[in-house]
Amino acid sequence: MLLENKVALITGSGRGIGRAMAKLFAKEGAPVFLTARTEKELGAVAKEIEADGGKAGFASADLTRVADCERVFAAAVKQFGRVDILVNNAGHYGPVVPVEEYPLEEFEKVINVHLRAAFVLSKLALPGMYSRKSGVILNISSLSAKSAFGWGSAYAAAKAGLLGLTRVIAAEAARNGVRVNAICPGPVTETVMSKELGNTLAKRLNVSPEEQLKGFLNSILQGRGQTAMEIAQAALFLCSDLSSAMVGQSINVDGGAAFF
């Protein structure tokens, strides 16, 4: 097993990419601690993991709040004793509006859940990782960090900031046995967020949702979106010893949508 007895804390793990990572990591031997806003979703994922013979714990949280970040991390350590792998995946796209119409409070909310939460949880995880001379932090960024789209300023800024944070922590942590990397997924078309975003963008562009999706997918070399499991498999690689020499990298898993 690639992650045997490596405790993983995965944010945003009630659905989509987070759920896929949690189930795959557990199958590879990791006790996983789940967190997201909706306790019902977390409980369902935990039951699926335990039914397959894995170990799981969970706590619902609003990671725009520093106190909730601290509470979730403490709960993971209380249940499993430590955090070996931190995956910062929680996300919220925010309003699909131009900059001049973007509400400041919504901008702050998106920045906080993507960027500040990742900073706070990394700050909490690093001392223990340093003491063990071992650990992995994986940040789930986005294609939006590299290829800007209109009407998503907070999301693009937060995801780009997450890449900067990845590189800084990687530079600080590498000599202490801790690896930090990021994944930039392309459109995961099966997720609720992708579908809702696509419908909203279609209205902005004055086209049907089907036309919007077709046009977007045509810009990708593979001509399709990605699945949550494809992102999870890349995450498994980056969180395992198979990627032991990879530090401070941002890996595109996007079907050929971007080349940098």
Segments and roles (model prediction):
Residues 93-96, 235-236, 247-260:
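Short C-terminal tail/terminal secondary-structure segment
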Residues 142:
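Residue(s) in the substrate-gating loop at a strand-loop-helix junction
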Residues 174, 179, 246-248:
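Short, small/polar-rich loop/turn modules that mediate ligand/substrate recognition or access, typified
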Residues 69, 97-99, 103-111, 216:
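Substrate-binding pocket helix/loop in short-chain dehydrogenase/reductase
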Residues 122, 158, 166:
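Active-site helix of classical SDR
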